[in-house]
């Protein structure tokens, strides 16, 4: 979760920060909740009451005032929402979203096309969470991709998915705080193995989630991550990118390797890392840098964060390494998801999702 060109003055300052204050506070909430083993809403209350100073807030939580009146003011842990999202049959709330054409349905059925969605679903934003979760899940049900890569999943969101998406197998990078997830359509994608690679110096609970699968006789290695956030953590983010690329290089030559996730990358950071290896491509660049799906974090178009500065960045990216015997799987198209506001007046996430279709050469 989570500027580029921004407007002058305050807008330029917003880009230098790389992420608004509200986002930093959500990360503090996650850290607090992890330490205190409490709900994120409880963490937010204690941090806000203590001027967002972690140590003061934790002391307040673990050593509350003994007066009865003070105890009564302590917020109760908020239980998991009782309404669950049905991934399998819910109508999309985006009336303008074009549906999959019959030819694409046929291509999926006969195995000549492979589809994926990657989306930072902004689970740390608790406002309108149930409505936004329904919005995200309606897109997943509409497009029914073979693989779904999600970032910023939180336990209640995971429960939505786990309880109502029986047609998908879900692998997560963690089970507490916030984490990534990979969802595999059981009818097409056969899981062979999975692994989690820790980022040893992360300050934000980040890691690399990998699964090895088989699709229509093709061996694939699928990866997702949520790289370190904010401008101030660029060095750590670049180290994490290097780990991702190294892992992609180490995958068996017989496998097609796909990484999809929220990289938080600025183009200059990729350049500073030496660029991508010769055998790994950025799918957006491979497809000719289409303008319609360039920016996945766009505060001019997306009002969820309430930022006045017009900031556009391509945080969410897909990296692709073909198998040694090239030509079996080829990226074909890329589109944005989640561009319409929901009935609650907000978008499903502060990020747009990415829908990628790939051709399988039979």
Swiss-Prot record:
Cross-referenced SUPFAM superfamilies: DNase I-like, UBA-like
Broad class of the protein's primary localization: nucleus
Biased composition range(s): Polar residues: 94-109
Residue numbers of N-acetylmethionine PTMs: 1
Binding, Mg(2+): 122, 152
Cross-link (Glycyl lysine isopeptide (Lys-Gly) (interchain with G-Cter in SUMO2)) at residue(s): 23, 82
Coiled coil (UniProt feature): none
Effect of residue 351 to A: Loss of phosphodiesterase activity. Delayed poliovirus replication in host cells
Functional note: DNA repair enzyme that can remove a variety of covalent adducts from DNA through hydrolysis of a 5'-phosphodiester bond, giving rise to DNA with a free 5' phosphate. Catalyzes the hydrolysis of dead-end complexes between DNA and the topoisomerase 2 (TOP2) active site tyrosine residue. The 5'-tyrosyl DNA phosphodiesterase activity can enable the repair of TOP2-induced DNA double-strand breaks/DSBs without the need for nuclease activity, creating a 'clean' DSB with 5'-phosphate termini that are ready for ligation.
Protein name: Tyrosyl-DNA phosphodiesterase 2
Gene source species: Homo sapiens (Human)
